[in-house]
Design a protein with these regions (language model features):
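Mature catalytic core of soluble alpha/beta enzymes
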Residues: 1-302
Length: 302
């Protein structure tokens, strides 16, 4: 009887250990599942716009930290207002010498000029003079005189931008010419963010850089992402339709985003390089679905 009692006790202890082990592993699985089901969400401000992120994965915090640092670097290189930026230095040196730039800047300017050629100049990276003249979206927005506009238009010319790949430098040949990468830099930044997320093993994320949206993978439940396309004639949040996508960039540009009104006429921020005035193409909004956000950004602006 004593022998049987000892065996029973041993069996009970083994059984209890097995049960506790199962409970322990189930608890770990549950905690991990909960972590996976709730994204890291953050809203920031950079590149002149509001940024929003939803990231799932155990490396989400580290990935977001690196992504924000990368965005900051891009902004530092391509700002038109920061005296330390490449673009600022190129602009103030227009009519003078070549200016050495970071490889990020050189790549984006090269892509911008490529899209200028492909669009026959409707996408125009040397439009900086017009942007500075109108100042739409700032407290100093204004309606320039016809003479001011004509002068700014005369300085536009993507064909004139000189690129020296060997020395990674850029030159604007005429004094007063100005680059502005506002129509393409956010797209480049979005692509760089997605590359960082992938390197960190992130499988599911939504990146929104002020309307430049990139959805990585699918949602955590394996369904496609739903990306709404804003109705330009309705208040924000009213959609023309919803795109169901994965691993895609969705970029929308519209004349409803930044504008001012004077004497009953609306002046928006998308310019026609040929006239110097806000474009009157008849299009209120353009949405581009693409594999790379830099492409969608440029095409939606053109």
């Amino acid at each position: 009887k004593n022998s049987e009692t000892i065996e029973v006790r041993i069996l009970k202890k083994v059984f209890l250990a097995v049960i506790l082990g199962i409970i322990f592993f189930l608890a770990i699985f549950f905690v991990k599942s909960v972590k996976r089901s709730h994204p890291l969400e953050q809203t920031s401000y950079a590149l002149g716009t509001i940024l929003h992120f939803q990231i799932w994965g155990k490396e989400a915090n580290q990935a977001l930290e690196k992504a924000l640092s990368r965005i900051h670097d891009i902004e530092v290189h391509m700002s038109t207002h920061d005296p330390n930026s490449d673009i600022y230095k190129v602009n103030v040196s227009s009519g003078s010498s070549f200016v050495p730039v970071h490889e990020d800047t050189f790549y984006v300017v090269e892509k911008a000029i490529d899209y200028a050629y492909k669009s026959s100049g409707t996408f125009e990276p040397t439009i900086g003079g017009l942007v500075n003249l109108w100042r739409i979206g700032t407290p100093e927005e204004r309606l320039p005189s016809e003479e001011e506009i004509a002068n700014a238009v005369s300085l536009i010319g993507y064909e004139e931008v000189q690129l020296d790949r060997k020395n990674m430098s850029i030159r604007l040949p005429r004094s007063g010419q100005h680059l502005d990468l506002g129509g393409i830099a956010k797209g480049y930044a979005a692509d760089e963010v997605v590359a960082i997320l992938k390197r960190k093993g992130i499988k599911s994320a939504l990146v929104d850089l002020g309307g430049n949206i990139f959805v990585l993978g699918t949602k955590p439940d394996s369904t496609l992402w739903n990306v709404g396309v804003q109705n330009p004639l309705e208040p924000r949040g009213q959609y023309l339709g919803v795109l169901r996508v994965s691993n895609k960039s969705v970029v929308t540009s519209g004349n409803y985003e930044r504008f001012f009104e004077k004497d009953g006429k609306r002046y928006h921020h998308i310019f026609d390089p040929a006239t110097g005035y806000p474009a009157e193409s008849g299009l209120l909004s353009v949405t581009i679905l693409s594999d790379r956000s830099i492409d969608g950004d440029a095409l939606s602006t053109a």
